[in-house]
UniProtKB/Swiss-Prot annotation:
Interacts with cer. The gene is Urm1. GO terms for molecular function: protein tag activity. C-terminal thiocarboxylation occurs in 2 steps, it is first acyl-adenylated (-COAMP) via the hesA/moeB/thiF part of the MOCS3 homolog, then thiocarboxylated (-COSH) via the rhodanese domain of the MOCS3 homolog. It comes from Drosophila melanogaster. GO terms for cellular component: cytoplasm; cytosol; nucleus. This is Ubiquitin-related modifier 1 homolog. The modification 1-thioglycine is found at residue 101. There is a cross-link at residue 101 (Glycyl lysine isopeptide (Gly-Lys) (interchain with K-? in acceptor proteins)). Disruption phenotype: Lethal; most flies die by the pupal stages. Escapers are small, less active, display a significantly reduced fecundity, shortened lifespan, increased resistance to oxidative stress, up-regulation of the JNK signaling pathway and increased expression of Prx2/Jafrac1 and GstD1. Simultaneous knockout of Prx2/Jafrac1 restores normal sensitivity to oxidative stress. RNAi-mediated knockdown leads to higher tolerance to oxidative stress. Belongs to the URM1 family. Pathway: tRNA modification; 5-methoxycarbonylmethyl-2-thiouridine-tRNA biosynthesis. Pfam families: Urm1. Coiled coil: none annotated.
Length: 101
């Protein structure tokens, strides 16, 4: 029997995808033996898929102001933000509200 996996979908919109190799959607198979919170996911994203200007996406251990995070179409602030524990087939959407003028 194989290692358990946690399958989730990451989506990036409104310019956030530019920081992640211009890829708008990624299906991930994370190690299912560990507990995955949004905090852990952000660290994984920084180490593995954040390709451009991390200061535009992260501020300390969280997303910077101006990045909206929706989990299954619900504002992450209603779900515990960094402490939210990811569930199988969760859809995590990052939307940038930071636009140049």
């Amino acid at each position: 029997m194989g290692t358990p996996e946690l399958k989730i979908i990451l989506e990036f919109s409104a310019g956030a995808e530019l920081l992640f190799g211009n890829i708008k959607r990624r299906e991930l198979n994370l190690d299912g033996k560990q507990k995955w919170t949004i905090a852990n996911l952000l660290k994984w994203m920084h180490a593995n898929i954040l390709t451009e200007r991390p200061e535009l996406f992260l501020q300390g251990d969280t997303v910077r102001p101006g990045i909206l995070v929706l989990i299954n179409d619900t504002d992450w602030e209603l779900l515990g933000e960094l402490d939210y524990e990811l569930q199988p087939n969760d859809n995590v959407l990052f939307i940038s509200t930071l636009h140049g003028g």
